[in-house]
Amino acid sequence: SAITILYSIFGIIYCALLASKFKVSLLFAVLQVSFYIVQSVLYKNWGEVILNSAIVLPIILASIISWYTGADKKKEQVTKNQLKNYEWILLAVIFVVVAISFYFILDALDTQNAVIACISCAFTAAAHYLLLRKSQYMFHVFIGLNIVLFILWLLPIIQGDGFGIESLPMLITLVVYSISNIRGIVNWSKEKKASLASVT
């Protein structure tokens, strides 16, 4: 469908810019998430609709402000944050609370594959918290999210529910996301080493 194609196009552009032009990529993330919400409505993945509308889109918009205001205007770099111990505890609590609460919400909405969907919601909340905090570990959590989402969108094909082959662009985009996140890990590691070298 046109929605799936547009989602994939904006998603691939987002991925292409993710590692090297992260702040610019967030602008395409807004478009990508918007089309993803529409796509999720068509597939009746209500967990994705609720979470992306109420949490992910606002977090990305807040992240755009955070990343642009935190940028070094000369180096075009952003100060990365090291999460404190209490934040990791908070992140774990967020993951568990979102997973459990969304399971009951999705079950009440008679959502297919509710268990996978609620795990996806938990990964989404955790990944975007790390995005907002400008943590390098967001890439690792986003890879986990991509794997869960791949399973979530693959299941309708396996189960023979509705859209079938129309899910393929979605699956391809998720693979591209994972590759891009791996690039992000490598890129940020290089930046960290360069930063440490300049200090010493």
Name every feature range the model reports, one short phrase each.
Residues 16-27, 129-141:
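Membrane-helix interface "capping/anchor" motifs
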Residues 131-199:
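C-terminal transmembrane-bundle signature of multipass membrane proteins
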Residues 1-46:
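N-terminal topogenic module of multi-pass integral membrane proteins
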Residues 34-43, 87-96, 144-156:
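Small-residue-rich segments of transmembrane alpha-helices in multi-pass membrane proteins
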Residues 31-70, 76:
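Hydrophobic, ordered structural segments
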Residues 51-63, 82-106, 120-123, 127:
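Alpha-helical transmembrane segments of multi-pass integral membrane proteins
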Residues 1-7, 48-57, 110-121:
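Structural signature of hydrophobic alpha-helical transmembrane segments
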Residues 97-111, 118-139, 151-154:
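Alpha-helical transmembrane segments in multipass membrane proteins, preferentially the mid-helix core
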